[in-house]
Structures are given as structure tokens and as C-alpha cells.
Amino acid sequence: MEINVYSASNKLESYVISAVEFAMAKFFDVKDLDKYISVDVDFTDLDVEGHCIDAGDGEFSIEIKKDLPLREKMIVLMHELVHMKQHIAGELEFGGIIIGKDGLKCKTTTWMGAEFDEEGTDYFDRPWEIEAFGRQLGLFIRWVESIDEGHHKKWQV
């Protein structure tokens, strides 16, 4: 698996690489991913905390709001890695994106093989968001424990 990190300090870059490897190992047999997965993680100006884009052919782009505190950046990364897992596993698929007055919107969304109507569903009630929010903190805590900074003050774990 290829991991590229942009707009990050050396320390943050090492955390991101470690966290991506950790989360993907929880989801998949990593040696299978090594063959075809590439992810770019960029810390940038965003109106939202983060998002994950499936660019196709095993290429993913994760952008995270650069102004977040370190702990929040890493939790958002875990959230977006759950979405990356959903795309890789074929659980979540966005069928084209349109740009509207309210920003980016998907033409169609497929969740677990069935078309899903996002229009009438609150963001927090979408099943892929329920999974991502439900797993982000647990992944974060287990990752922190794995890097031997378990209850370090900066992580507030």
C-alpha cells in the first residue's frame, strides 16, 4: 500500500502513516492491499472536518481540515479510513458527483448493493456515517495504545 502525506510536519506524517497501516490491518489482510491501494492524505483548508474520495483504480484521496487539534485530526483520519474501507470492500459506492448550489452531491449512492436515497436522510442517519462515527474512536484509541503513547496527555485517552 502506498501512503503519501502532504502539508504535515514530520511527526504528523509518521502518525498518519502508522494510523493508516494500523486501520487497514484491522479491516483487511494487508498483503492483499499492498498490490493495488494508494492513498494521499492532505491537511488543507476545508469547510468540513474531512472527506475521502475514491478516485478509482485503488487510488484514494483523504483531505482533513488543517486547523484541527492533533487529536481531532487523527480521529477524523480514522473516520475517513472507515469510508476508504467501505469503498475498497464494495460496501459504499458513489455513482457520480454533481456540483449544486449547496456544494458537492452524489447522483446515486449504493450501500451494501442497494441504491440509497440521500436526499431524505439526515447525514448522521446514513448507514455509512453510522459505521464511520461508530468506529472512529475505537480505532483511534487502539492505534494510540499500539504506538506506546497510550495515555499521553496530548491524546486524552
Model-identified regions with their sequence ranges:
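Catalytic Zn2+-binding segment of zinc metalloproteases
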Residues: 81-98
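Short coil/turn segments at secondary-structure junctions
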Residues: 4-7, 64-68, 116-123
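Short alpha-helical functional segments enriched in proximate histidine and acidic residues
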Residues: 76, 84, 88, 135, ...
